[in-house]
Amino acid sequence: MKKIKKIMAAIDLSDYTCSVLETAELLAAGLQAELLVTNIINPENIETIKLAEQLEHDYKNFFQAVTADNYLEKIKEERSRQLDAMVEQLGMGHISARKIYRVGVPFEQLIWIVKDEDVDIVVIGPKGKTNLSTVLFGTTAEKVFRHCPVSVLSVREKKSDDLRACMFLESKKGQ
């Protein structure tokens, strides 16, 4: 069996994110492997901002100046802040994880990252934030399972019913 040197935690800031992070960190520590934490930004959100940019021209006083570029930067900053808060709250501040943010179709981008980064195993939650798209298209996790060229570990346990509790309100360590 090939030695696991690089582990990718695919997070979407759903209720499973904290458990995915903890599991990936335990694996990385136990195997002395590099940890990548990935988050994909849905392009539909960017398209909405581009539409708002067009409308801004007609409704200058109604919209603040928002561009797709500064929206993308703000989203990356916010998600990075949320991830840092989760890592700290879970008592994982000692880990060194490289963060990767991409824009695109989530399962496609995750597969590209696996190939580009030579990832050995992917840790992912079984579903994301909503079940609406699942009815029509299937979950990102299902597509990753079908198309991923490496092993995929599905974390079934929710850390919390409320992601905010995991990030900010509950102190897991020190209480």
What are these model-derived regions, one by one?
Residues 140, 148-149:
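Short, structured coil segments at secondary-structure junctions
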Residues 121-143, 161-164:
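Glycine-rich, Arg-bearing micro-motifs that act as flexible, cationic patches
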Residues 58-78:
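A short acidic, glycine-rich active-site loop
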Residues 2, 43-45, 73, 77, ...:
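Structural beta-alpha unit
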Residues 38, 98-102, 153:
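General small-molecule cofactor/ligand-binding pocket signal
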Residues 2-65, 160, 170-175:
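Small/aliphatic-rich secondary-structure junction motif
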Residues 39, 126-127, 156-157:
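Short secondary-structure boundary segments
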